[in-house]
Amino acid sequence: MQTLADLLNTIPAIDPAAMSRAQRHIDGLLKPVGSLGRLEALAIQLAGMPGLNGIPHVGKKAVLVMCADHGVWEEGVAISPKEVTAIQAENMTRGTTGVCVLAAQAGANVHVIDVGIDTAEPIPGLINMRVARGSGNIASAPAMSRRQAEKLLLDVICYTRELAKNGVTLFGVGELGMANTTPAAAIVSTITGRDPEEVVGIGANLPTDKLVNKIDVVRRAIMLNQPNPQDGVDVLAKVGGFDLVGMAGVMLGAASCGLPVLLDGFLSYAAALAACQMSPAIKPYLIPSHLSAEKGARIALSHLGLEPYLNMEMRLGEGSGAALAMPIIEAACAIYNNMGELAASNIVLPGNTTSDLNS
């Protein structure tokens, strides 16, 4: 059985030679150089991922939704009843939530995974990786032990790698858990070094008069638990949550297979920050789907060095933004594989080069 350290060491580097070949190929297509903007850059990024073997393409698609409750809910940082986590998870099994509808539109399968829902019995239809019935209250204790965090990371990495073996080439991450923007803000504040007041937002419509308490809870959680910002596992274990750990595991697992991962919103940015602390090599595999409307989104993305492809003013979570952006990935692959070449049409444009995939 591989350890977490073993798996982190297997993450392959992006192939610069494949990216150079892709650049030359794209520059030789029936268009002025650079005229398809970020779509071209995305195709080149995909070409460099070893799991795609130098040719941007999409096989099976999967959105992995990590569902968990949070002890910090007891601090009054969310207005939704905690039971909504279990109710919505069950709705996901029926295909009626936002991410399920958008994933179906994109032709992606949704994997609903219980990593820490607070119910007496597992919910039928969910993939059971439950660690505990909710995380600890980070305002008064760590979210979980380091051992719990490492085991869940390893379990999710292995699950993700198994999906890749079965033909999934494009992953999306999502989450579900009442009060989970609070630990996400704590992670972002810890790793970026920004004050909680700069990153704490309203989450799922928290009244503005309750925002001061939420900021205070995040500040207390960080002061009490003293997470090490250089240690992603430590941050997740002390001020994170099981859903955040799970998302980090998907990112690490997909990257270990040389495959792309579409981020979702603010929660996924926080998980990505922690995952990048564990292995900076995963960063080229992360594709930001959309700009979350949550307050600390820009701060987190700036620290990651990522610019989202969409700005739809969304803050639903669940993986909805990741599902929505999947057709953009397919569009980047389509232009690479299906457009004609300038040379074949005897067109010469300034700055364009003849396509040569073999050079």
Swiss-Prot record:
Active-site positions on this chain: E318 (proton acceptor)
Disulfide bonds: none
Catalytic activity line of the entry: 5,6-dimethylbenzimidazole + nicotinate beta-D-ribonucleotide = alpha-ribazole 5'-phosphate + nicotinate + H(+)
Keywords annotated in UniProt: Cobalamin biosynthesis, Glycosyltransferase, Transferase
InterPro entries, per the entry: Nict_dMeBzImd_PRibTrfase, Nict_dMeBzImd_PRibTrfase_bact, Nict_dMeBzImd_PRibTrfase_N, Nict_dMeBzImd_PRibTrfase_sf
Sample GO molecular function, one term: nicotinate-nucleotide-dimethylbenzimidazole phosphoribosyltransferase activity
Pathway field: Nucleoside biosynthesis; alpha-ribazole biosynthesis; alpha-ribazole from 5,6-dimethylbenzimidazole: step 1/2
UniProt-listed Pfam families: DBI_PRT
Enzyme Commission no: 2.4.2.21
Top-level taxon in the UniProt lineage: Bacteria
Gene Ontology biological process terms in this record: cobalamin biosynthetic process
NCBIfam families in the record: cobT_DBIPRT (TIGR03160), PRK00105.1 (NF000996)
Family: Belongs to the CobT family.
Function: Catalyzes the synthesis of alpha-ribazole-5'-phosphate from nicotinate mononucleotide (NAMN) and 5,6-dimethylbenzimidazole (DMB).
Protein name: Nicotinate-nucleotide--dimethylbenzimidazole phosphoribosyltransferase
